[in-house]
Amino acid sequence: MIQLQKATKVLKPLKGFLYGPTASGKTYSSLKIANGFVQAIRGCTEEEAYQHIVLIDTEYGRGSLYAGIGEYNYVECVAPYETEKLVNIINDINDMDNIDVIVIDSLTHFWSKKGGILEQKTIADSKGGNSYTNWNVYTSKFNAMIDAILESPKHVLITARAKSDTVMVENDKGKMAPKTFGLKADLRDGFEFECDFTFNVDKATHTLFVEKNIPGMDLIYDPATPDLGKLIYTLATENAKERVRTVPEVANSIRTISKENAMIPYVQLSLSGRPLESLSIEEILKLEKDLINEVKKKQIKR
């Protein structure tokens, strides 16, 4: 029989999504929001906060152009944009105690650009493979990347380019003028629902329109500032409690990791015949951490 418990607000790493047309201000907005997160976490100045942010740049080095706003950390990821590359980068950053926020700019490249999921699937189809089977294979790869983002202990802000359209609209002077709208993210449908909050960034004004919010947020922010980051962090963490993992939960995690990575013998050797559930929470958490480190070493050797 299931056990019911009272719903409680739990502390968790925040995942935010910003999408919009090229030059709408996604990168700048993400860095400002990330800065607010860090200020709220560490109680530091705006200048100091950038030291605890890392930007993963897929935009051909454009992410470094914002260096004038602060000394954030920077990693460039180049084509081919295989999902495994991003997973490895995130896993490395997860172990860095000085980093609080990861900005991924942008996730679109791992979906529709050179070496991304769509191109890999097209190549597999051209070699005579079954299209349905190929989708299963590459959907699994994409899902593994999304899982790495969502399961990261860091706060993560993700950007994506938007498929856009330009239409004639009446401006504030009563004249017709072209306006570019970001219609939908150039990414697998539904990704925005995986995140805690989503902004559609307007190209002309850099205004952030809220499409998914944390309770208490307004519908429009113009422009993005560190204060917006502080607000989001405060709304998400106010009266929240630290989540406590249970022994059975960690045991299931260990079983899954060891099975997926052919590490069952390692776990059995570490247990010396003891059942997983007989370990204390401290012992089983250490085993999980050691197992993850061994998996990373194994992947590097490949």
For each predicted feature, which ranges?
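Glycine-rich phosphate-binding loop used to anchor ATP phosphates in small-molecule kinases
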Residues: 99-109, 135-166
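Interfaces that engage single-stranded nucleic acids at replication/repair/recombination sites
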Residues: 1-20, 24-26, 30, 35, ...
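Helical mechanochemical/support elements of P-loop NTPase systems and associated helical scaffolds
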Residues: 82-85, 131-145, 149, 183, ...
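Post-Walker A helix-loop "phosphate-sensing" segment adjacent to the P-loop in P-loop NTPases
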Residues: 35-53
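Phosphate-binding/switch region of NTP-binding enzymes
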Residues: 19-23, 147-231
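Hydrophobic helix-cap positions at the C-terminus of alpha-helices
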Residues: 37, 93-96, 149-152
